[in-house]
Amino acid sequence: MVEAGIHGTLCGAIIALFIPVNIKGQINSSFHKLEKLIQPFVNYFILPLFVFMNSGVLLKDFSFRSVCSSLTFGIILGLFIGKQLGVMLFSYPCVKFNFCSLPSNTSWLKFYSIAILGGIGFTLSLFIGGITFEGGCPSNSMRVAVIIGSLLSALFGILVMRYCTKSK
């Protein structure tokens, strides 16, 4: 289908139309077996690969020296530190001055773990970076920095969330 000019996303949607889900009011157990079988593969391999391939990082222009620039560190720190700092510095005074409240059964540590995950802003960061650095070497460095910053935010957020659930 791709060779015929149909986009890969549309190919996947068309194929999904032919997977039987509900036949005569009964749930198709073979579909659920297939779903459970492929879910880890899709979550931990296909989706990350899809994100990386669509990020536009050019591996032929990649060098470690370009990753060690002040631009790259600024983007990484902005995503990893800046997002969580911004969310917490805005939210804490709002709660303390009773403009809003934390949801019930939510501690500040749990809220902080969500603030960390705010640094995963992958799509919007790539969009803004693409407008700022049209083509050239800074564009590739920006894309690598966004991936690194998003990964750091995701991994640290998961660690803090696991700590929150274990400390109960």
From Swiss-Prot:
Keyword set, alphabetical order: Cell inner membrane, Cell membrane, Membrane, Transmembrane, Transmembrane helix
GO process annotations (BP): regulation of pH
Gene source species: Rickettsia bellii (strain OSU 85-389)
GO molecular function: sodium:proton antiporter activity
Membrane topology term: Multi-pass membrane protein
Record-linked Pfam families: Na_H_antiport_1 (PF06965)
GO CC field: plasma membrane
Official protein name in the record: Putative Na(+)/H(+) antiporter NhaA homolog
Keyword Zinc among UniProt keywords: no
Compartment(s) of residence: Cell inner membrane
Transmembrane listed as a keyword: yes
Primary residence: membrane
Transmembrane segments annotated in the record for this chain: 1-21, 37-57, 70-90, 111-131, 144-164
Family according to the record: Belongs to the NhaA Na(+)/H(+) (TC 2.A.33) antiporter family.
